[in-house]
Amino acid sequence: HSSITNVRLAGLAVSTGSQTRDFMADGLALGHDRVMLERTAQTIGLRQRKVAAPGITALDLCEDAARRLLDAAGLDPSSIDAVIFVTQTPDHSQPNNASLLHGRLGLATGAAAFDLSLGCSGWVYGLQQAALLCAHGGAARVLLCAGDTLSRLTNPGDRSTDPLFGDAGSATLIEKTGRSTPLHFVLGADGSGAEASA
């Protein structure tokens, strides 16, 4: 358990893929049974998802979200002290997405940039890291981006995973503040069952 004070979430912007995939239409086109598709749709609660157009990456989606966030907040990119990029679908192995976004946005050369390779828990881990940078690392503003294009990794014939994953990017602004209301974190992991998901 940890609590971090003097930090606030100052803004959030999201950018989704521009195309819409329909779970039922995709499943019927692959020859799946309509009754089974209806049952699956009822279970997962989704019938549509947003996916990125060909050539659009997680970096592109997060850049769009970050630009809109900075514009809405009236902030110059040079006021950002660090960028954290959470993704499991980076554009390249090197350089990392955070460094590429740093360059695209024109952040100051003194601004830190690093990726976190995490899935569902990634934004929360990124938020903790951003809050720590603001509270104890000398940063006044941190840009936390989380984005993936997981639709490109799933098998369209797999009804258990394909309908769950779309493509999106988000940008969250975390700022140092005099406010004492703490952010509370309880982080943990259990890697003992990793082979069960393979």
Give names to the regions the model predicted.
Residues 9-10, 40, 79-86, 112-114, ...:
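Beta-strand segments within the central parallel beta-sheet cores of soluble alpha/beta enzyme folds
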Residues 135-168:
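Flexible, glycine-rich active-site loops centered on histidine and acidic residues
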